[in-house]
């Protein structure tokens, strides 16, 4: 279990923070069979927990992360109090996912670059980093690995599995692969599968990495370099899809970086400066091989594929109650994609609540502190708490 410590004397945190947290490294020796037919053994998963697991282990909530996030869902680290968890506004004492009532688990997925076994890890067969030799992983593989984490805690059924974007896909996969192991499935700003346009954006991003001279076929670690140029462009492309046109107009408009145009190809507009800043920052902390793996996992997710593309038939296996939420200006995973999932659930007479939230911030709205959005989540978790007596 993650240690939750008192903050250092010099560090003052809000009363609704989970405080200073320490992640736990879980080691699993038993091979994990992957969807591609291979397996991986002797792997690690980074885990953080918040709150207290009750006696009957009924108050656990699994939070699944999106592309560039990790197990660090909430709180801060003692050695870097600026590193606040990526969903800190959602998880904590008195917050929508209230850690006074729920035991919350964050798991860093296989293939990531934040401590779980991935391309940067040492391949026991060679003694060198896996690099391009790391197996392609899928959403289903992540869910199977997360189930093993639940087993370690003795959790037979989650009160809820929750996620936004790619995290929402993992929540859907949980409802299909382990239907008896979750009471509620909370899917935010997500989709039952990527559209051709979504896949196209991922392909352009991957191509920018693959064509970077410093990529070296994915084995750039041995060369002491990193394909930062490709990562920068990939992040810039992705970031455009996370924001709405309205939000970009409000933040940047056509504002120039300097007073007058300079008739050059240097940064002229504020929006250019912003994208370059985001790209530079991302290239410093993220791994290119991980980016390739996770975007490909996004592409492959399609639970209806085994049912001839019939999502209604696919969702017939679910037993959980659902909350599905979308945002009006999200064009990466537009509201109609969430409605596809809702329709499939209703066709199967499954209990589902749906909210389409009018918010100007595009796809990234699921990470923001919108009162209507948070009130929705708070009310739904109040309902879950009442069900389980938390």
From Swiss-Prot:
SUPFAM superfamilies tied to this protein:
alpha/beta-Hydrolases (SSF53474)
Name the Gene Ontology molecular function terms of this record. homoserine O-acetyltransferase activity; homoserine O-succinyltransferase activity
Every AB hydrolase-1 domain range: 59-369
Q: Which residues bind substrate?
A: 235, 364
Record-listed E.C. numbers? 2.3.1.46
Name the reaction it catalyses.
Answer: L-homoserine + succinyl-CoA = O-succinyl-L-homoserine + CoA
Pfam families associated with the record: Abhydrolase_1 (PF00561)
One GO BP annotation of this record: homoserine metabolic process
| Protein name per Swiss-Prot or TrEMBL | Homoserine O-succinyltransferase
GN (gene name): metXS
């Amino acid at each position: 279990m993650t240690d939750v410590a008192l903050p250092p004397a010099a560090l003052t945190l809000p009363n609704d923070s989970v405080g200073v947290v320490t992640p736990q490294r879980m080691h699993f020796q038993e091979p994990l069979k992957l969807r591609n037919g291979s397996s991986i053994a002797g792997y690690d998963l980074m885990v953080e927990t918040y709150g207290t697991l009750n006696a009957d282990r009924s108050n656990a909530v699994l939070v699944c992360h999106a592309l560039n996030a990790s197990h660090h869902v909430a709180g801060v680290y003692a050695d870097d109090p600026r590193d606040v968890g990526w969903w800190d506004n959602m998880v904590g004492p008195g917050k929508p996912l209230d850690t006074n009532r729920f035991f919350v688990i964050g798991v860093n997925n296989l293939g990531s670059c934040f401590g779980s076994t991935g391309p940067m890890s040492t391949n026991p067969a060679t003694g060198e980093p896996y690099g391009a030799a790391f197996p392609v992983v899928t959403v289903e593989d992540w869910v199977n690995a997360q189930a093993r984490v639940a087993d370690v805690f003795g959790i037979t059924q989650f009160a809820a599995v929750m996620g936004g974007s790619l995290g929402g896909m993992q929540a859907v996969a949980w409802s299909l692969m382990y239907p008896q192991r979750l009471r509620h499935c909370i899917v935010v700003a997500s989709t039952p599968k990527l559209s051709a346009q979504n896949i196209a954006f991922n392909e352009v991003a991957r191509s920018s990495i693959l064509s970077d001279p410093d990529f070296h076929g994915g084995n750039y670690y041995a060369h002491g370099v990193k394909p930062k140029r490709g990562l920068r462009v990939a992040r810039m492309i992705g970031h455009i899809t996370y924001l709405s046109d309205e939000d970009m107009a409000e933040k940047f408009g056509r504002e120039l970086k300097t007073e007058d145009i300079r008739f050059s190809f240097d940064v002229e507009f504020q929006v250019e400066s912003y994208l370059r800043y985001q790209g530079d920052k991302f290239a410093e902390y993220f791994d290119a091989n991980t980016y390739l793996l996770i975007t490909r996992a996004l592409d492959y997710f399609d639970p209806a594929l085994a049912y001839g593309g019939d999502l209604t038939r696919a969702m017939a296996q679910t037993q959980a109650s659902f909350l599905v939420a979308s945002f009006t200006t999200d064009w990466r995973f537009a509201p109609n994609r969430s409605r596809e999932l809702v329709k499939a659930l209703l066709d199967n007479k499954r209990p589902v609540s749906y909210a389409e939230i009018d918010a100007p911030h595009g796809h990234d709205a699921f990470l923001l502190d919108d009162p209507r959005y948070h009130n929705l989540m708070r009310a739904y978790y109040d309902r879950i708490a009442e069900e389980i007596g938390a």
